[in-house]
């Protein structure tokens, strides 16, 4: 059903998946990352500040899987829950993931992707640059 591009991290490639149809893995992507985001129908990601800012700026339907409180400061949990509350994201805690639950969540997200795009489009934060420029222009008068 899906074509998957998996960014695994340095030293975490799984060679047993090399010939899997519809699946490509990379340790890291730098210059092409914005192109991959632009081409994606949906994004599955951790919930770090940079990731969620990129996802929301591009209005990509997304599934956030935050690092657990044991593996982080807890900021990713807060980020993901905030985005979920605003209707921007679907969230699964790492501890609750099963193959079936992950696949069903992805299918639901894809089916309802327009509602996530619409929620992100309505965000008052989407025109932050315009607001800042407006404030600067007002101050310059």
Q: How would you name each of these model-derived features?
A:
Residues 24, 39, 82, 101-108, ...:
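Alpha-helical elements of Rossmann-like donor-binding domains used by nucleotide-donor carbohydrate transfer enzymes
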Residues 1-42, 77-80, 92-101:
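Donor-nucleotide binding loops and adjacent catalytic segments primarily
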Residues 37, 52, 76-80, 99, ...:
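A general structural signal for well-ordered alpha-helical segments in protein cores
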Residues 111, 125-141:
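C-terminal alpha-helical cap of glycosyltransferases
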Residues 59, 77-89:
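Acidic, glycine-centered active-site loop in nucleotide-sugar glycosyltransferases
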Residues 86-93, 97-114:
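C-terminal "capping" alpha-helix adjacent to the active site of nucleotide-linked donor transferases
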Residues 33-73:
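A donor-sugar binding/catalytic signature common to diverse glycosyltransferases
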Residues 114-126:
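A short, well-ordered alpha-helix in the C-terminal region of glycosyltransferases
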């Amino acid at each position: 059903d899906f074509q998957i591009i998996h960014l695994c991290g340095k030293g975490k490639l799984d060679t047993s998946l090399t010939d899997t149809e519809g699946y490509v893995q990379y340790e890291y992507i730098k210059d092409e990352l914005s192109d991959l985001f632009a081409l994606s129908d949906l994004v599955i990601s951790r919930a770090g500040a940079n990731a969620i800012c990129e996802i929301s700026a591009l209005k990509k339907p997304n599934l956030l899987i935050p690092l657990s409180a044991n593996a982080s400061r807890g900021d990713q949990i807060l980020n993901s829950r905030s985005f979920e509350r605003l209707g921007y994201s679907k969230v699964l805690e790492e501890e609750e993931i099963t193959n079936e639950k992950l696949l069903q969540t992805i299918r639901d997200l894809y089916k309802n992707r327009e509602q996530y795009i619409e929620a992100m489009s309505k965000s008052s934060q989407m025109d932050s640059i315009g607001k800042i420029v407006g404030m600067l222009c007002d101050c310059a008068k």
